């Protein structure tokens, strides 16, 4: 399955999610041993080239400076990146910050975390509205049959007869499986060039190979479907 598609696949604004859901238990605080480290919120001097938006701060959590993050993917479906990454980048309007994360854990369908330098509820509450980014290199490794959506965006799609079908422009999660949005050049009713879209289920019966190195996906799908 896959996580939520943010609909913005530009560099540094990529959508996020994994293909196959795996159950993950996060009863214990991740990396709790780092809680004694010191740090603070800092203005982001450099924005990572591989920054991927993974959620947004929606509320304070508790009284000791923890924040609650609504994630674009649940734990086990890609949201684990928030639990693994020890450094987050935050954006709200023109304001950009970087912060070290002391502790984090899954909480219901959200992630709660303690940013370094945020010591009380008021300071945590003031962080509402920040969009949360982590580096792609901080994503947890996936099994051979799993893919992050961010890695599929822009790949060429061809069928088994090597007919070009377009490029992956986005992904949709319909609650049962993922669906690729494949854009291709077309001609409008007025004869002018336009862009059309194919929707191809991202399931094994249709998706035969995903070659990220070659940036190509081979599917069992005809051009006139």
Curated annotation (Swiss-Prot):
Pfam families reported in the protein's UniProt record: PRC_RimM (PF24986), RimM (PF01782)
Chief location bin: cytoplasm
SUPFAM superfamilies: PRC-barrel domain (SSF50346), Translation proteins (SSF50447)
Alphabetically ordered keywords of this record: Chaperone, Cytoplasm, Ribosome biogenesis, rRNA processing
Location(s), subcellular: Cytoplasm
GO biological process: ribosomal small subunit biogenesis; rRNA processing
Domain (PRC barrel) ranges: 144-225
GO molecular function annotations of the record: ribosome binding
One GO CC annotation: ribosome
Top-level division of the source organism's lineage: Bacteria
Subunit structure: Binds ribosomal protein uS19.
Function: An accessory protein needed during the final step in the assembly of 30S ribosomal subunit, possibly for assembly of the head region. Essential for efficient processing of 16S rRNA. May be needed both before and after RbfA during the maturation of 16S rRNA. It has affinity for free ribosomal 30S subunits but not for 70S ribosomes.
Protein family per UniProt: Belongs to the RimM family.
Entry note about domains: The PRC barrel domain binds ribosomal protein uS19.
Record-given protein name: Ribosome maturation factor RimM
UniProt lineage: Bacteria, Pseudomonadati, Pseudomonadota, Betaproteobacteria, Burkholderiales
